[in-house]
């Protein structure tokens, strides 16, 4: 048994851990969990925990449903609150999902990302990610379609001390840091009730695990503070939606491969081709980075979200932004992709972003001129004249772009690609057939 497994088993005994929760993520990004007693963990390390894969979204067909969850000891952390008896703690580990013969399950989101990271490694790169995660705090209420009510009336950077949960961010950050997740900073975002917590850089797989842990902890802390948290991309028509702006960089050993001292923006050829790859394939990957019908209510003109495939230095109206806070700090050279929302599957999102960027690097894509104007204010004719391709305006548009994409099919693997398309087509058709209050209000008198 290796040292990490021995450390986990020893910690369970020393901390008197009562339950071990084994986590994994389905294809749509929902967190799944099975709890085992500490005495069962050594066996789980050796043989895994079997479960019915046909009962998990996108995993397996009923006639080939035996699936195994194998805990990854490197992800072991003690949860930051006690069990219901008030005397014990629980711990959690993420799992890799395999078939009974030990081969990776093609439906495992972690495996999808691992394959892209292995490709980056073959090219000599390690991928690091830093997300800005936005979400809303709402007052308690039914989940029946009733319009939600924000927990406060604050705005951008406001010190909202009179809200319904004045200590929420402090409580959330304390919980995150107890789980080994480093927070860079936090603040109130632009809309009432909207919060942002930025996680410090980590390798892409660890960060995807961190994002799943983040969403779980934030919801639990919110409930404890008497409010509820929502990662819905656009819960309020009149306010900006919730993004997960994703900062990415590639390193070669300890060297930032995105940095070049000879460029005016200090961007290397690798960085420029990486950006060009994301711009070229932006429409194809949109259904993954923005996977819900509601996601496209956020990606609208004037919504503080990208609507065209453009890039720029410090330009927040562009799809890809090059942050210029510290222009002479080599280690911080990075690109920020502004389209993903905080309700995406982070494993699949990081995988397709990396696949698009690496395609640009491998093929030597040439980056066009940067956007120096406010892209939101340009007409469609002006955008076309400048070479800015419109991003999908609906989930239906995004699926049309995705279904013929060799890049996305290769990045996700045939199983996840086919299931994702089937599931999302069903979601889109269900939405298209739904008659909304807007239609009744405006058209019933016809």
Curated annotation (Swiss-Prot):
Its EC number is 6.3.1.2. InterPro entries: Gln_synt_N (IPR008147), Gln_synt_N_sf (IPR036651), Gln_synth/guanido_kin_cat_dom (IPR014746), Gln_synth_cat_dom (IPR008146), Gln_synth_gly_rich_site (IPR027303), Gln_synth_I (IPR004809). It catalyses: L-glutamate + NH4(+) + ATP = L-glutamine + ADP + phosphate + H(+). Binds 2 Mg(2+) ions per subunit. Belongs to the glutamine synthetase family. It is an enzyme of class 6 (ligase). The record marks 61 as: Important for inhibition by glutamine. It is found in: Cytoplasm. L-glutamate binds at residues 241, 298, 304, 316, 338. Oligomer of 12 subunits arranged in the form of two hexagons. In its feedback-inhibited form, interacts with TnrA in order to block its DNA-binding activity. This is Glutamine synthetase. There is a cross-link at residue 363 (Isoglutamyl lysine isopeptide (Lys-Gln) (interchain with Q-Cter in protein Pup)). It comes from the Bacteria. GO terms for biological process: glutamine biosynthetic process. Residues 15-102 form the GS beta-grasp domain. One of its GO terms (cellular component) is cytoplasm. Residues 109-446 form the GS catalytic domain. Mg(2+) 1 binds at residues 132, 245, 336. ATP binds at residues 184, 247-249, 316, 321. Keywords: ATP-binding, Cytoplasm, Isopeptide bond, Ligase, Magnesium, Metal-binding, Nucleotide-binding, Ubl conjugation. Inhibited by glutamine. It comes from Mycolicibacterium smegmatis (strain ATCC 700084 / mc(2)155) (Mycobacterium smegmatis). Mg(2+) 2 binds at residues 134, 189, 196. The lineage of its organism: Bacteria, Bacillati, Actinomycetota, Actinomycetes, Mycobacteriales.
